[in-house]
Amino acid sequence: MKEDRVVFIFGPTAVGKSNILFHFPKNKAEIINVDSIQVYKEFNIASSKPSKNLMKHIKHHLVDFLDPEKDYTIGIFYEQALKIVKEIRQKKKIPIFVGGTAFYFKHLKDGFPSTPLVTSKIRIYVNNLLELKGKSYLLKELKNVDPIRFNMLNKNDIYRIKRSLEVYYQTGIPISQFQKKQNSEFKNIVIIGLKRSFEDLKTRISIRINEMLNSGLLSEIKGLFSKGYNENTPAFKGIGYNEFLLWKSRPCYGLNDIIGLINKNSFLYAKRQMTFFAKISDVLWLHPEDDLDNILNLIFKVDKEI
């Protein structure tokens, strides 16, 4: 058995990733979800979590397990994913990574940077610095402790600014001095990219948003607000949720404005996803419907070689 053999299936939002899985035989594979918002509990509709029927058909991992107030990082995902792959292999099944978070796929394929994990105490400390002293202070501090990293970063990339300082405060070593990446844990990967025309994606995104509204998205949003979730809640960074923060804070934004904004942001996100995915090598690009038989044959080929 080739323990490091895995399958990647990725593509932009609304391309039709989940539909393919219904065609996969039961008990042949398990899915490792690659989505930074679907991990959160309670944030169900706009995140387009896999349906109960799909999760009954094929077991899914890393879906609907995390408190919405907690951060979810690439480091946490990577560590969890490696553990789950081993568990799936022990069951003689195929581990299939499915999702749209391109950054996660990149590190699964190329290897994860060997920077250390950071304690919650350090994260809270850096967040407090940001809240009390502002981004300009963090930039000044980063320039002092790690000028190499400072010159590399987009000065509006607050996530990486915070991450750089967290690593320094945790270890006393600039993040720029750590090895940039290690070798991938996976040596044999079948990579399937799903594609559609942008016009087709645009139509499907619009249909999906209407389906979300019909499924009770507004009630879900109101329920989340009533529980105290707000702009500081990590789960609210997702498209389809973040836009409703405007609805709450600025009465001039009507529901139609918010829906239009979700449509716009979703399509722009799909374009960014495709741009990022295009940088990943060794991808076989296929249409989720026209090439369905080819997709299933590729996966069954892996099955036969195990």
From Swiss-Prot:
Name of the molecule in the record: tRNA dimethylallyltransferase
Required cofactors, per record? Mg(2+)
Keyword field contains DNA damage: no
Give the site residues for Interaction with substrate tRNA. 101, 123
**Positions that bind substrate:** 13-18
Q: Which InterPro entries match?
A: Dimethylallyltransferase (IPR039657), IPT (IPR018022), P-loop_NTPase (IPR027417)
Catalytic reactions of this protein: adenosine(37) in tRNA + dimethylallyl diphosphate = N(6)-dimethylallyladenosine(37) in tRNA + diphosphate
UniProt keyword terms in alphabetical order: ATP-binding, Magnesium, Nucleotide-binding, Transferase, tRNA processing
- Extract the Pfam families matched here: IPPT (PF01715)
Query: To which protein family does this belong?
Result: Belongs to the IPP transferase family.
Query: Which residues does the annotated region (Interaction with substrate tRNA) include?
Result: 35-38
Q: How does it assemble?
A: Monomer.
* Protein residues bound to ATP: 11-18
Any one GO MF term held by the record is:
ATP binding
Q: What is its EC number?
A: 2.5.1.75
- The gene designation is miaA
State the function annotated in the UniProt record. Answer: Catalyzes the transfer of a dimethylallyl group onto the adenine at position 37 in tRNAs that read codons beginning with uridine, leading to the formation of N6-(dimethylallyl)adenosine (i(6)A).
Q: Which organism is it from?
A: Borreliella burgdorferi (strain ZS7) (Borrelia burgdorferi)
GO BP, one annotated term: tRNA modification
